[in-house]
Amino acid sequence: MSLANNHARDFGEAGRLATMNTLREAGIHHSGLEGDFATMEVNGLMVAVLAYAVTRNSNMMLDYDLARDTVSDYADTHNIVIVSFHGGAEGRDRTRLPFAEEVYYGEPRGDVVRFSRMMVDAGADLVIGHGPHVIRAAENYRDRLIAYSLGNFATYYGISVEGIKGIAPILVVTLDSEGHFVNGTVHSTIQILSLIHI
């Protein structure tokens, strides 16, 4: 599970540590804190999950060279490398990829195409993006799947899920043992905000 996002510290460092402890107790691997990468064995293959964001105390997406070198190192020792990133500008008008550095309210949010392709070139087998709160394009780049944004999935009260911001695709991907994209299925879902009155 990726903890690399701008809401991971909504409840301070104590909340973030509590989340990490809860995930660990449940046997769920996590990545995202600076220097925190998940590794596991799946069906006899060593898999690494490296999560990046543009926020402090995270593995920094904006340091393209360090991210590239880290992915390359993990690709040397793991069969499959999955990269997750939280980047790109936000909003219902951000569905199209700008192929350039993005900024949101003055905060640099990265060039998601450059970052993603650089990670594949360094050895990543699957790259999954999130952050813009809307779905974005996916591409098969060098036989590796890049999904630039899967939109909103489990959103709490206060975040709009109206219209395009409520679309939340679930992506199921099959890779071969070398990390090549074999096939995938998109399960379409729509979030509906419901309030529970206590």
Residue ranges with predicted function:
Residues 1-196:
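Acidic, metal/ion-coordinating pockets
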